[in-house]
C-alpha cells in the first residue's frame, strides 16, 4: 500500500519517527523526483535476529578483519554511497529530501550508520532507523566485495548485544534471504512492531568509539 505526499516539506524527522511507529516508511520514485510517498507492504521483510545466518566463506572474511568496521563515523558518506548508482541499480529512491530527513534523524540519535573501510577508503556500509527495540534497515552499498555483507554481520551483532527484538528489512531480496530474511503478513508485522516498541534497546551496547573485531561480532551471533 502506498500513498502520495505532495507536501514533502511538512515531513519532519519527528513525523518520520511516528510513521515508523505505525509501520510505514517514505520512498521517492527517483533521485530527481521531489515527491515522497508512504509505503506499507502487504508482506514485510524481516530478519529474525535469532535465526541470522552467516555463510562459512563470509565468516572467514569477517573473522580476518580485512575490513575495519566503524559506527556513526561517516553517516553522510554512507547515505551518499547508498544513493549512488551500483551494478544492477542505475537509479535510486534516495532523493534530496530523503537524504535531509535521515541526516536529521541521525542528528537526534535515531538513525545510525555502519561503515566498512578498506585501506582508509569507505568500501561499503549501511544505515537504518532505531526506535525502541526495533531497527529498520534502510539501505546498504558496497564498493568492495563483501563490504555490505560485513556491515550487516556487524549490525546484527550490535543489535543482539543491545537487546533489539526486530530487524525490519522492509522487503526481501535473494541477497537478504541468504541471511535468513523472511516475509511476514502485515498484521503479524504490526504485532511484532508493537511488542518491539514497548522497550528500549542500546545501539551503543558495543563500543562506538573504536572498532569491534570480526571475531567478537561472530561470537555474539553464535551465542544467540
Swiss-Prot record:
Protein name (Swiss-Prot/TrEMBL): Leucyl/phenylalanyl-tRNA--protein transferase
EC number per UniProt: 2.3.2.6
BP terms from Gene Ontology: protein catabolic process
Location of the protein in the cell: Cytoplasm
Reaction catalyzed: N-terminal L-lysyl-[protein] + L-leucyl-tRNA(Leu) = N-terminal L-leucyl-L-lysyl-[protein] + tRNA(Leu) + H(+); N-terminal L-arginyl-[protein] + L-leucyl-tRNA(Leu) = N-terminal L-leucyl-L-arginyl-[protein] + tRNA(Leu) + H(+); L-phenylalanyl-tRNA(Phe) + an N-terminal L-alpha-aminoacyl-[protein] = an N-terminal L-phenylalanyl-L-alpha-aminoacyl-[protein] + tRNA(Phe)
Coiled-coil spans in chain: none
Pfam families: Leu_Phe_trans
Any single GO CC term annotated in Swiss-Prot or TrEMBL for this entry: cytoplasm
GO molecular function: leucyl-tRNA--protein transferase activity
Lineage: Bacteria, Pseudomonadati, Pseudomonadota, Alphaproteobacteria, Hyphomicrobiales
Organism: Rhodopseudomonas palustris (strain HaA2)
Annotated family: Belongs to the L/F-transferase family.
Domain of life of the native organism: Bacteria
SUPFAM superfamilies attached to this UniProt entry: Acyl-CoA N-acyltransferases (Nat)
Record key words, sorted: Acyltransferase, Cytoplasm, Transferase
InterPro entries: Acyl_CoA_acyltransferase, Leu/Phe-tRNA_Trfase, Leu/Phe-tRNA_Trfase_C, Leu/Phe-tRNA_Trfase_N
Transferase in keyword set: yes
Keyword Membrane belongs to the record: no
Role according to the record: Functions in the N-end rule pathway of protein degradation where it conjugates Leu, Phe and, less efficiently, Met from aminoacyl-tRNAs to the N-termini of proteins containing an N-terminal arginine or lysine.
